[in-house]
Amino acid sequence: MAQGDDNKQAIGQIIRQEQALIFPSLDENDAFSLGQRIRDIAVKDKLGIAIDISLWDRRLFFAATAGATADNIEWLRRKFNVVRRFHVSTYRLVLEQNREDRMFAPYKALDVADYALAGGGFPIRVSGAGVIGAVIVSGLPQREDHNLVVRAVAEHVGQDPVALALPAA
């Protein structure tokens, strides 16, 4: 199958993820539980990552595991800005934009210092409220960052993470 076809299938699956992974509500306790779930997976699998769960106006959860770097923290911020701007998964945008340089097209006027075209940011969509924030992971290859977030969010909201997972690249 051609790369373009693979991307189209992955984009379709990510759209299904975004439609299925809706929180009934989200408060500080939910954010802590979800963040701890991601951290537990990372510690068990020895993944060096940084984790951020934020609403548009404030951070609710942050953690880093052994192996995470200061660069990962900066990537969290830039991925958050992308989710805030577009209200979709950052990996979806990576596949839609199909750019090797990880920068948005110049006509979008998005400074690379503030916006990263890289997987690992996922919108927090609350039933009846819409997108209110983002769950972000940084430290793994971008598809793995995305898959880790989707797995944890799916488990948190009672969806089957296997059914929603992207196929191996």
From Swiss-Prot:
Q: Which SUPFAM superfamilies match?
A: GlcG-like (SSF143744)
What family, per the record?
A: Belongs to the UPF0303 family.
Q: What is this protein called?
A: UPF0303 protein BOV_1367
User: Whose protein is this, by species?
Assistant: Brucella ovis (strain ATCC 25840 / 63/290 / NCTC 10512)
Taxonomy of origin reads: Bacteria, Pseudomonadati, Pseudomonadota, Alphaproteobacteria, Hyphomicrobiales
